[in-house]
Amino acid sequence: DMHEPSGDFERLALAIEKQWNIQGLKADLAIMRRLQPVLRKGDWKVTVAVYQSHDGATPRILDLWPGFYEGSIYGLAIDLGSTTIAAHLCDLRDGSILASSGLMNPQIRFGEDLMSRVSYAMMNPGGDVEMTKAVRNALNYLADVIATEGGIDASSIYEMVFVCNPVMHHLLLGIDPVELGQAPFALATSGAVHITARDLEVTSVNVAAQVYILPCIAGHVGADCAAVALAEEPNKSKDLVLIVDVGTNAEILLGNESRVLACSSPTGPAFEGAQISSGQRAAPGAIERVEIDPITKEPRFRVIGRDAWSDDPNFAELIKDTGVTGICGSGIIEAVAELRMSGLLDAGGLMGSAEQTGTNRMIPQGRTHSYMLYDGTTQGGPLIMVTQGDIRAIQLAKSALYAGARLLMDEMGVDHVDRVVLAGAFGAHISPKHAMVLGMIPDAPLDKVFSAGNAAGTGARIALCSKSARAEIEATVGLIHKVETAIEPRFQEHFVNANAIPHFTDPFLLLRAIAPLPNVSFNTQSGGGEGGRRRKR
């Protein structure tokens, strides 16, 4: 219309306002450059992808197509963990998951745990930049991989939602995490973050893709814990629920509709197979389940990817494609718990000798003994042992986990909880009974211990698909009270008491009613043979 001075964008914005009540629409220059050809190709009919934030920020056009576009648009929900990066590819029309994928966090080469990475940044000028580049490269790769698995073009990904612990949060954003390594553990920002994928140098997705990062709760309690709270909703529970997100850095929530507490506990990577002599990440061929006969002391096990136990006559044939390659986190937890229940391991965490235990599977190694779980050396495979060092690594990890939970219970003024929820991608595979035998979690009825799977990833997916959920979690984190384990003297007391298996002072009466905990002690001198003298404590 020669008599209508408005530009094509202004007319489009007015039409969208009239039809969809979306006001104040904006568009980047890249959209402006495409606008007129698209409008004319579609004979002034157009489909527009609009990003409209829950907080009233300016709505923006992300993409447009001539005529009626019937294709889908997609989003990524990403749990950016210290050890692994897990992602869900979701159809933004209905929230369905097209594909899920993950990879190891490449920052592991700079340090296996969070404080090691903070130290790397402190000690090496530009170290934070190196770690930021590594994780961003991994995200580009992961986006391409998951798009291929989902059968879509990565350029159809228009939004990414991240949940992560505070150190990963800062490194993702390119913020030096040094302040998180020293009191008062100050975050550069604790609120939700709205940016673009370009800001994070994630270029494999759509050029206009938006990024939302959930808010952090406090200095050591991050957006991953907020995502768990969003998924599990302890603030809406009438029962007192303890939620433990098991990982390299455990996040713990305790609460009900009256009050919610949170803390972070530095468990380290042992639960994920690291720092274990035959440890590996969960993958086909890794031992994931273990049982030890309390009479014969003989083991049997299962590996990831096969349902058969190792005492199955056809086991060798069934695992010929994968073999037995090592032991993952759930496997080492069950192995240590089974050693305790079969009387091969005492409450203090010491393993006995062959003479003390009556089994030649106890192999002397210097001044300690190890339990031979599997010997595949005659077929060119590995010798998989549970060593005294493995036991100690698990003791330290589980003590940190228990101490964090117990600290929250002290703050709440309770000795028992109504429900326990094991969360995290790894938490989904933990046997509640074996976790209780180890003393990873406080004593509770086994039928009140549940697995929530990767609750942080679930929370990320909820936030990806729901604007109201984003508003809800932003309000909820302000009501969660954070307990700082690093400066709380009772944490160390609880940690020391939790070194025993299951515990030095807590009798674990509910556990003892269903699981044998033999009253054995190997902290003595034993006769003859290498390794006969036990280490004293």
Name what the model sees in each region.
Residues 106-148, 275-276, 284-293, 393-396, ...:
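N-terminal phosphate-binding loop and adjacent alpha-helix
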Residues 203, 216-231, 395-399, 449-484:
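Glycine-rich phosphate-binding/hydrolytic loop that grips phosphoryl groups
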Residues 164-179, 255, 361-364, 414, ...:
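Short glycine/threonine-rich loop-to-helix capping motif typified by GTGT followed
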Residues 85-103, 158-159, 163-191, 335-338, ...:
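Carboxylate/His-rich catalytic cores and anion/metal-binding grooves
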Residues 256-261, 275, 406, 410-477:
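Catalytic phosphate/nucleotide-handling subdomain of diverse soluble enzymes
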Residues 1-77, 82, 131-136, 140, ...:
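Nucleotide/phosphate-binding catalytic cleft detector across ATP-hydrolyzing
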Residues 340-410:
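A contiguous, well-structured pocket-lining segment that forms one wall/lid of small-molecule binding clefts
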Residues 78-82, 87-115, 178-194, 227, ...:
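Glycine-rich phosphate-binding loop of actin/hexokinase-like ATP-binding domains
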